[in-house]
Design a protein with these regions (language model features):
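Hydrophobic beta-strand-centered segment that forms part of the acyl-chain substrate-binding groove
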Residues: 42-94, 109
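Short, electropositive, low-hydrophobicity segments enriched in small/polar residues
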Residues: 26-28, 51, 128
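Hydrophobic pocket/interface hotspot
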Residues: 23-24, 83, 124
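Catalytic strand-loop segment that frames the active site of acyl-thioester-processing enzymes
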Residues: 1-45
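Solvent-exposed, charged/polar functional surfaces in cytosolic regulatory/catalytic domains
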Residues: 37, 41, 45, 68, ...
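Short aromatic/hydrophobic contact patches that present stacked aromatics
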Residues: 14, 66, 115
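HotDog/MaoC-like acyl-thioester-processing domains
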Residues: 1-11, 74-78, 86-148
Length: 148
C-alpha cells in the first residue's frame, strides 16, 4: 500500500449496514470513530492504555481534528486504516495522522490529523507529558515517506 508515512500501525475496517447514511455511503462520523479506535489501539501497542492514563493523571486530548474525505466507501468494502505519531514538542503537544485506503484499488479515501495536548485528567488543564509518554510516543515519530 502507498502509505504517506513509513511503518504504519494498521487495523482492518469494513463498513457495516448501520454505517451507511442517506447518501448510500459510509457516514463521515464513522471514520472519526474508526480514528479514535485505532488511536487507542496504537497507544496500547506502545504500552499506554486508558488505565495508564488514569494512573498517571495525564492524557493526550484532541485539541483539533481535521479530516479530508477524499472518496466514498460502500457497504462491505475492505479497507485498511493506518495511523502514525508525526510530531511532538516533547513537552505538551503531539500530532497524530491517519490514512484510510480502499484495498481493492489502493485508493486513499480519507486523510486525517489530530493536534493533541497533554492534560491532567483531574483538572483538564495542560500539563507536561510524563516520562512514560515521552518514552513510548517520541520513539516512534514518523517522517513522511518519499513520494514519486
Amino acid at each position: 500500500m502507498n502509505w504517506d508515512y513509513p511503518q504504519p500501525f494498521t487495523l482492518p475496517a469494513m463498513p457495516q449496514a448501520e454505517d451507511i447514511d442517506g447518501l448510500n455511503h459510509t457516514n463521515n462520523a464513522v471514520y472519526v470513530q474508526w480514528c479514535e479506535k485505532i488511536g487507542w489501539a496504537h497507544s496500547e501497542s506502545l504500552g499506554l492504555s486508558l488505565g495508564d492514563y488514569q494512573r498517571l493523571d495525564r492524557a493526550m486530548a484532541i485539541r483539533r481534528g481535521e479530516y479530508d474525505y477524499l472518496l466514498p466507501t460502500a457497504l462491505g468494502e475492505t479497507l485498511t486504516l493506518a495511523t502514525w505519531l508525526t510530531a511532538s514538542d516533547g513537552k505538551l503537544t503531539m500530532e497524530r495522522r491517519f490514512q484510510l485506503i480502499r484495498n481493492r484499488d489502493q485508493a486513499t479515501v480519507l486523510r486525517g490529523r489530530w493536534d493533541l495536548v497533554c492534560i491532567g485528567l483531574s483538572t483538564g488543564q495542560a500539563r507536561r507529558m510524563p516520562p512514560e509518554f515521552c518514552q513510548a510516543y517520541l520513539s516512534v515519530l514518523a517522517r513522511p515517506a518519499d513520494r514519486p
